[in-house]
Design a protein with these regions (language model features):
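Class I SAM-dependent methyltransferase SAM/SAH-binding core
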Residues: 70-117
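A short SAM/SAH-binding and catalytic strip from SAM-dependent methyltransferases
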Residues: 126-138
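A short glycine-rich, Lys/Arg-flanked "PGG" loop and its adjoining helix->strand segment in the class I
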Residues: 140-154
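Short alpha-helix
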Residues: 180-195
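Conserved Class I S-adenosyl-L-methionine
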Residues: 199-271
Length: 271
């Protein structure tokens, strides 16, 4: 099986398993209840990924952020750019991005409310795409369009699936192993198939403090595991919490959880 087909099958299998566990249809905008959590000061000085990207991207360039979310990367990078084009399909995320841009007077950002494969944008100097690809089924078309629209491509992703820390809980709660999404290892295989030789840099980030309380842990884990109140799965989850969580530095984290750190995968498309 080719690397691109393997990628697509992993995404489809994970999505099918998720759909099978859901008790209700997902909302049209899956970020509507959480978009406000992605607000961030564009001029913050404690974000190692932002600092890394600002050093790597020369000032005065036109930048494209594909899957820009609430602007956590797009707005800080816009401060040094000639122009920032932020492509984002979620209406609630676009609203947050526009609000934060207005609040902090960042005026050189064009928001394109669209999926990437449908978006119509001009060619830019640099395209960035952070923590988006894990769920993209047509990975080849997605990457090729990035290459067609940028002199340099910078993809940010973890060395493992973003939710991999809770995969062991999935089996304990549901009785079956969690089917993983693809991440960095599979992406490098895809790039190899596409004859791309990227540079890969690790951005060392501090561990997340975790959940603020056991109650917040229960609520968030239940949502991520598609567990509903008063169900046998919720009963199992509640019984497991004190076994699988440890209190550390004022928060609760999953014991033995992998420390996910972003990798910046960059290359200059040929031609």
């Amino acid at each position: 099986m080719s690397a691109t087909k393997c990628w697509t099958e992993m995404v489809r299998a994970e999505h099918a398993q998720s759909d099978n566990m859901r008790r209700e249809e997902p909302p049209a905008d899956s970020w509507s209840n959480f978009a406000q959590n992605f607000r961030a000061d564009p001029r913050r000085t404690d974000d190692v990924l932002v600092d890394y990207l600002r050093k790597e991207i020369a000032p005065g360039q036109v930048i494209l952020d594909v899957g820009a979310g609430g602007g956590r990367l797009a707005l800080p990078l816009a401060l040094d750019a000639e122009k920032m084009i932020a492509v984002e399909p979620s209406p609630s995320m676009c609203q947050v991005l526009r609000e934060v841009a207005d609040e902090f007077d960042v005026q050189n950002v064009d928001v394109v409310e669209s999926g990437w494969l449908e978006a119509q944008v001009s060619r830019v100097d640099v395209a960035i795409c952070a923590h988006v690809l894990y769920v993209i089924q047509d990975i080849e078309a997605f990457v090729r369009k990035l290459e067609e629209h940028a002199g340099q491509v910078m993809v940010i992703m973890y060395q493992g699936p973003p939710q991999s820390q809770i995969y062991p809980l999935w089996e304990l709660v549901h009785g079956v192993p969690r089917l993983p999404l693809p991440s960095l290892p599979e992406f490098l295989e895809v790039l190899g198939q596409l004859r791309v030789e990227p540079n890969v840099e690790v951005v060392h980030a501090q561990r997340n403090r975790g959940f603020e309380s056991l109650e917040i842990a229960r609520e968030q884990l239940a949502r991520r595991l598609y567990v509903t109140p008063d169900s046998p799965q919720m009963e199992r989850l509640e019984g497991l919490l004190r076994q699988v969580l440890e209190e550390k530095d004022g928060g609760f984290t999953i014991k033995g959880g992998i420390h996910l750190e972003p990798r910046v995968v960059s290359w200059r498309p040929s031609g």
